[in-house]
């Protein structure tokens, strides 16, 4: 019904383009989490800003509706694995960008040992070799829910699903070499 809504940017750019401290901090995060470009980082920073902004507004608000929204925000962040189960609204204000970047599918695939490097994890996801909860996800920036974390595997249709795949054997060998 009607026209589709206007597409809007999902991120805010920094207010000043050449602040050295911010550029250095962004470069470290880009390298550590193997992000494609700054826009990916800015999207997650904007998401974090929005969570924190909502928390500040809800801390000041009173009433039934504010209480409902508090519970909804906390439930969402707990479902995403960003907050522990016993968290309160003040804990939202202490979230960092690293907390969100740790919940990306790309990071979790690497940490679970399904890929040798962050870059390989990104490639496996984009090429459709990774599935979450039986669904192939092709977005490395997908934020994995806490209950989905255990369901991340190689896709059934992927050659990587075969334990005898040469690349998979190299990943296993690298895992054993790291443990020894």
From Swiss-Prot:
Keyword RNA-binding: yes
GO cellular component terms given for this protein: small ribosomal subunit
Gene Ontology terms, MF aspect: rRNA binding; structural constituent of ribosome
One BP term from GO: translation
Membrane-crossing segments per the record: none
SMART domains per record: Ribosomal_S4 (SM01390), S4 (SM00363)
Sorted UniProt keywords: Ribonucleoprotein, Ribosomal protein, RNA-binding, rRNA-binding
Pfam family, any one: S4
Domain S4 RNA-binding as annotated: residue spans: 103-174
Protein's job: One of the primary rRNA binding proteins, it binds directly to 16S rRNA where it nucleates assembly of the body of the 30S subunit.
Quaternary organization: Part of the 30S ribosomal subunit. Contacts protein S5. The interaction surface between S4 and S5 is involved in control of translational fidelity.
NCBIfam families cross-referenced by the UniProt entry: PRK04051.1 (NF003139), uS4_arch (TIGR01018)
Family: Belongs to the universal ribosomal protein uS4 family.
Protein name according to UniProt: Small ribosomal subunit protein uS4
Organism, scientific name: Pyrococcus abyssi (strain GE5 / Orsay)
């Amino acid at each position: 019904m009607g026209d589709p809504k206007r597409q809007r940017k999902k991120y805010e750019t920094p207010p000043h383009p050449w602040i050295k401290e911010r550029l250095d901090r962004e470069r470290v995060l880009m390298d550590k989490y193997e992000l494609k470009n700054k826009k990916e980082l800015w999207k997650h920073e904007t998401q974090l800003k929005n969570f924190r902004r909502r928390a500040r507004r809800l801390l000041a608000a009173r009433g039934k509706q504010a209480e409902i929204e508090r519970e909804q925000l906390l439930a969402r962040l707990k479902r995403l694995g960003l907050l522990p189960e016993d968290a309160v609204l003040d804990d939202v204000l202490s979230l960092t960008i690293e907390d969100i970047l740790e919940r990306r599918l790309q990071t979790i695939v690497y940490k679970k040992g399904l890929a040798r490097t962050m870059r390989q994890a990104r490639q496996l996801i984009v090429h459709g070799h990774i599935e979450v909860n039986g669904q192939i996800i092709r977005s490395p920036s997908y934020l994995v829910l806490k209950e989905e974390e255990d369901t991340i595997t190689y896709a059934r249709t992927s050659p990587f699903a075969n334990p005898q795949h040469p690349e998979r054997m190299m990943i296993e060998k690298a895992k054993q070499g790291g443990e020894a």
